[in-house]
């Protein structure tokens, strides 16, 4: 599922992504579902994270959605420190708009208006394609203010990692995005409750 468009569409062409039903899920979510509906669907799906721990994605979204805060964040951890690991790289290079769409849906579900993609600087093709995808999505009104005319605002920034293995760990990555040395934080509190800049983060 995650790789369905890789090698099928031109990853630098938003129209090709849209032609294979890209951004339809975001449109459906924003126009016919509540944030709780989205969290419930993800919970029922049984989807788990790709990082190895297998934590249920819906549970994490539920924790963040239920956390009371005026500011929340969605962070994509695309910092692969394991030698020879290309799980994230494959998706980022082959289907970057899918990553952006998923992050926007997650943002709606938890009440976030800002996202970050933390990607290794050693992946220049992935970085380049993400930059193009973000620019295209903004031009099409799929990132930024009032997406699909619904009043939902969500934008994404790139942050380049310096290749430190430890920044693959989620709390170290958050510390790095904040501009500090990437060192893991004690848990609890977990990022879904107190994450980036001390705010709920998935």
Task: Please annotate each region the language model reported.
Residues 75-94, 110-113, 118, 128:
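A structural-propensity feature for long, helix-poor, extended segments
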Residues 95-109:
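Histidine-anchored nucleotide/phosphate-binding helix
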Residues 9, 17-24, 76-88, 191-197:
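Gly-rich Lys/Arg/Thr-decorated short loops/hinges at beta-loop-alpha junctions or inter-strand turns
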Residues 1-45, 112-117:
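Iron-sulfur (Fe-S) cluster-binding modules
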Residues 127-202:
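Hydrophobic alpha-helical positions that pack around
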Residues 18, 30, 34, 42-46, ...:
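Structural signal for hydrophobic packing residues in well-ordered secondary-structure cores
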Residues 44-64, 106, 161-175, 179-181:
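Conserved phosphate/anionic-ligand binding catalytic regions in large, soluble enzymes, centered on
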Residues 35-38, 44, 68-73, 86-87, ...:
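Short coil/turn connectors at secondary-structure junctions
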């Amino acid at each position: 599922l995650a790789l369905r468009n890789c090698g099928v569409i031109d990853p630098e062409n938003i129209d090709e992504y849209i032609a294979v039903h890209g951004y339809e899920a975001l449109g459906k979510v924003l126009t016919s579902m509540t944030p709780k509906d989205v969290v419930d669907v993800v919970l029922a799906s049984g989807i788990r994270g790709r990082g190895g721990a297998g934590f249920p994605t819906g549970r994490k979204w539920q924790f963040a959605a239920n956390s009371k805060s005026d500011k929340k964040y969605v962070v994509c951890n695309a910092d692969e420190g394991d030698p020879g690991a290309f799980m994230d790289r494959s998706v980022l290079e082959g289907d970057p708009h899918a990553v952006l769409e998923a992050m926007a849906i997650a943002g709606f579900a938890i009440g976030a208006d800002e996202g970050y993609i933390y990607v290794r600087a050693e992946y220049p093709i992935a970085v380049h394609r993400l930059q193009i995808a973000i620019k295209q999505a903004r031009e099409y009104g799929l990132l930024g203010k009032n997406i699909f005319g619904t009043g939902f605002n969500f934008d994404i920034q790139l942050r380049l990692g310096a290749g430190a293995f430890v920044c693959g760990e989620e709390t170290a990555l958050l510390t790095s995005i904040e501009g500090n040395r990437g060192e893991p934080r004690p848990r609890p509190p977990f990022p879904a409750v107190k994450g980036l800049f001390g705010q709920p983060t998935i």
